[in-house]
Amino acid sequence: MDKPVSFLTWDQVATQLTEAKHYWICSVRPPTLEAPGGRPHVVPRWCVYVDGKIYYDGSPETRHAINISSNPNVTVHLESGWEAVILEGTAKMADKPSPELGEKLSQAYKKYKEYGYTPGPHSWDEGGLFVFTPRQCIAWSKFNEDPTKFIFEIEQDS
């Protein structure tokens, strides 16, 4: 007898996103004089999941930042292949966060305290913050039993 198929809830996936410490971000390289564009670039990042978006910080001069400035389409996935969470969406340099968002980000980043990283609510006032907005998510904890796809409504920039 086959096992019944079940689905993950968004709360289960959101918990994984909130608790995860290692995220992988895959962007696409633009063309250069040395090489054609379209080559993937993957980098591990420390991220936080706040208000339905993934935030991470870094220099605008890094490879992934250069990539998203020309092509914002990005894939983000968590470390586990057994309890997979794979998101597709867009990333961009974030505006200065509001005081409320800065506080939420600072609180969320406390999960990295054991690694000596504890940014404060105003750490991104001068920039260096990126935001990833998911379009869809594929997740599973038991591949043949509960693969689940979520599709999100995208806010239009005004």
Where are these regions (language model features)?
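Amphipathic alpha-helical interface surfaces
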Residues: 13, 64-67, 101-108
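Tryptophan-centered motif/residue detector
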Residues: 10, 24, 46-49, 140, ...
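Short secondary-structure boundary/capping segments
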Residues: 14-15, 46, 66, 120-122
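Charged, gly/pro-rich active-site loop segments
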Residues: 1-7, 83-158
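Short beta-strand segments
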Residues: 20-60, 66-68, 74-78, 86-90
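Short, basic/aromatic recognition patches
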Residues: 2-24
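A generic local structural motif
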Residues: 9-12, 41-43, 61, 117-118
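Generic marker of residues within folded, mature protein domains
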Residues: 15, 37, 79-81, 122
